[in-house]
Amino acid sequence: MEIAVIVLLLLGGVMIYNHVYRKKMYSEIDRLEAWKISIMNRPVPDELSKVKQLNMTGETEQLFEKWRQKWDDLVAVKLPDVEEKLFDTEELLDKYRYAKAKAVLREIDQLLRQAEEEVQLIIDEVHELIGSEEQNRTEIEELRTMYREAKKTLLAYRYTFGVAAAKLDEKLEEIESKFKQFEELTASGNYLAAREIVLSSKGELNKVTEMMSDIPELLTECQTTIPAQLEELYDGYKEMKQEGYILDHLQIDREIVQKREKIEQCMQMIGDLQIEEAKQGITEIKEEIDTLYDLLEKEVISHHYIKTEMSRIEEMLNELNEEAKETSEETLFVQQSYRLSTKDLEKYRSIEKQIHQLMKRFEIIQARILEAKTAHSLLKEELEQLLAQIEMMKEEHEEFRKMLQTLRKDELVAREKLDEMKKKLSEAMRLVQKSRLPGLPKSYELQLSEAKDSLMKVAVRLEEKPLNMSAVHQALEESGNMVQRVYERTVEMIEQASLVEKVIQYGNRYRRRYPSVKEGLEEAEFLFRHYDYEQALEQAVAALEKVEPGALQRIQQIFRDERSKEE
């Protein structure tokens, strides 16, 4: 019973699926049928009838026949074939050959897609042809108007076009011949070819119109403006030479000849209607003329600079030379009291030598100015370099003078430092006396003696004539380090001695109970009486820490508290 139910359900499912699938396939057939009908109803015949209104010869006739044949082939062959395939699909569905039917439907879809593209191509090409004819009629009239205006302008103002007039005539004649060619192509039905003529004529005419706009101005530049600039430049050049300017290095004569040759080349370019090349050439000529003007102006500015700066530079040099002489005398005087390093002496000799060289260079420039054979711009550059070196020498010379002045200041500072170190050493000795130590370690006495000797060496260095400040500074540094070490050790030694006493006093409470403490404290006392305070402290602390760990920290705190109260 259950099996029968399952079989019935399966059969029912198959029947439902079969029904739904067949319905879907028939819907696809209906869609393709509607598509086929829409293609057949496209207005191709109407579009082709518009073509018949044109001149049905030549290219137009050939295109019309091509389009008509394609349409006839679609209507008579390809679309009926589609219709037949649709019927075949229905028969396949009736026989439940769904896979085959689906393949045929895909084929029909592809055929209709191709047919749609062919129809659209026919319509687009027809529109292009008809549109070309309409555009041609409109644009050719505009071009004829432009042509007549250009012809009229060339005739009325021919003199303004000069050498280019003949070539412009030729260009306009070429355009006129294209108009005739356009008429012939249109009459023979070759509208697309005629369209190409319209486009090329439009480009040529626009180009000619632009040339006619530029040529008069370019000719004015070549025939009037630039020659006038060259004359003005040459007159200025001659006037400057008469005033004594040295201008041979600019080669103005040769430059002007070259510019005139370039003008002739530009005129030839204009005559050949190479307008862009002529524009570029004229621009280059004008830039080169501006450069020549700039060079002449540079000579004028340089002349003014020399005229105004020579006396100032001479005054600066003389002032520097006088200061150097004073510094030389000051150096000799300083050397009586201070010993200058070889490096410092070499530096000063170098400064003297360079100042002498600067004086010689200035004299040479003066002579060249009087000789009047060197361009002012070159002399100006040399003077600027000389001025920069004078400024540099002034700085170096000032640094050397400051160094001499610093020597005396350094001596005073060194004497002050010596006094400070003596006071510091005396303070250390006062602290020792105040502490009432039983005695001093041999190593400390030796260190103290060395510090005193080092202070004596500094004092001796400061009394030398001439005074060697480099040696003084070295002796000061060594002595300062020694005094500082003595002072630090003094403070440390006094603190250790005081702390030993505190530790022993604190540890006395354990003497009777702990023999080890008694023994350790006795050893510490022995070391203390022999002035070894550091070892005494270590011995006392070691003995005490065995019975009371952390005792040292507590004693140190007590020690610090007592010192704070005393202060």
UniProtKB/Swiss-Prot annotation:
Main localization category: membrane
Superkingdom of the source species: Bacteria
Extracellular side: 1-2
Membrane topology term: Single-pass membrane protein
A GO CC term attached to the entry: plasma membrane
One Pfam family from the record: EzrA
Topological domains, Cytoplasmic: 22-567
Cellular location(s): Cell membrane
Transmembrane stretches, start-end: 3-21
Coiled-coil portions: 97-188, 254-465
GO annotation terms (biological process): division septum assembly; septin ring assembly
Annotated family: Belongs to the EzrA family.
Function summary: Negative regulator of FtsZ ring formation; modulates the frequency and position of FtsZ ring formation. Inhibits FtsZ ring formation at polar sites. Interacts either with FtsZ or with one of its binding partners to promote depolymerization.
Name by which UniProt lists this protein: Septation ring formation regulator EzrA
Gene, per the UniProt record: ezrA
